[in-house]
Design a protein with these regions (language model features):
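Acidic/His-rich, metal-assisted hydrolase cores and their charged scaffolds
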Residues: 1-174
Length: 174
């Protein structure tokens, strides 16, 4: 899915923000013309990366690092002390991603205990989700806004605070 999304993104520069548009104008459709860059289409191709010798950079959609291809990459790399794992974005409580950024020394992946020797980094500024102000702006542009919102995403305190904010600022049931 990420490969397809990347292809769509590369063919729609009119949707880029100012910074990305400047890069596109500089490099054109060669924006990702990086030597040895490979996209994997199947889970099997992705797992084969772990069998390749030598150093590598694996970019994977991690989500909360609880399911999918990322588990194979973590299982095969967390124990390497010369490995670094960069987790981009928020990680919910109770998830593998949260345990890693909080410094767990061992995790269970696919039934196997894996020692964490890799360096773990968290880049908090990345998110595929709109923030509170972006959601309020989106709501403000609706021609016929709904009579009520159901806030179902996020940890309880943040979701509850956002629901209160919706009610206070917009007079909308949430």
């Amino acid at each position: 899915m990420a490969s397809k999304a990347t292809a769509i993104t590369l063919t729609n520069p009119q949707e880029y923000d100012e910074e990305a548009r400047a890069l596109y104008e500089m490099h054109g459709n060669r924006l990702l013309a990086i030597p040895n860059l490979r996209f994997t289409a199947t889970a099997q191709e992705s797992r084969m990366i772990n069998e390749m010798p030598g150093p590598k950079i694996i970019v994977s959609a991690s989500g909360m690092a609880d399911a999918g291809r990322i588990l194979h990459h973590l299982k095969h790399n967390l124990w390497h002390e010369n490995c670094s794992v960069i987790i981009a974005g928020y990680q919910a409580e109770g998830t593998m991603g949260r345990r890693l950024i909080e410094g767990s020394k061992q995790v269970k992946i696919m039934g196997e205990d894996i020692k964490v020797n890799a360096k773990i980094y968290n880049m908090k500024g990345f998110s595929a989700h709109a923030d509170k102000e972006q959601l309020l702006e989106w709501y403000g542009k609706m021609k016929q806004p709904p009579k009520a919102f159901f806030v179902t995403h996020g940890e309880f305190d943040a979701a509850s605070n956002f629901a209160d904010e919706l009610q206070r600022r917009l007079g909308t049931a949430a």
